[in-house]
């Protein structure tokens, strides 16, 4: 499982702790952000926590198909990604058709993308892109924390906690890779 744009890494650290049988890779393109995640992990490990199933990589997400083999990744998490609000930057959005095509190259046959955001416009864009790319939308909600089914097992990110505490609804979608016969 990978998280693209992992930020400080807490989400993946929580998942790695909950599921020691699954390997997690955090992808981050900014050195300063990656350094903060490494420091946080080191601090937790000094207190006795073990993260043998957690790895971090400094890489641009556009290069994912060059790093991972076809069918190597089970799940991709996109949490509170930069919305790139200007129309001319739409291809930079991590839920654009261009990025979905990259994910399609590395996911297993029934691989999934899970996306969370507080940005309704980005979420609506993402729903359209999933459909246009021919992916199967397994589930979606404009208010995760009031959707009993989708909130089950939810691991919150730092941004999610912050925005939820301010009563901002959190949007979430789960898209399944398009089936190629």
Put a short name on every predicted segment.
Residues 4-7:
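Class I SAM-dependent methyltransferase "Motif I" SAM/SAH-binding loop
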Residues 9-13:
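Glycine-rich SAM-binding Motif I of class I
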Residues 30:
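Conserved SAM/SAH-binding beta-strand->alpha-helix loop
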Residues 35-40, 125:
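Short alpha-helix adjacent to the SAM-binding motif of class I
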Residues 39-71:
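S-adenosyl-L-methionine
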Residues 95-109:
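A short glycine-rich, Lys/Arg-flanked "PGG" loop and its adjoining helix->strand segment in the class I
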Residues 110-117:
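Conserved beta-strand signature within the Rossmann-like core of class I S-adenosyl-L-methionine
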Residues 126-128, 132-181:
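Class I S-adenosyl-L-methionine
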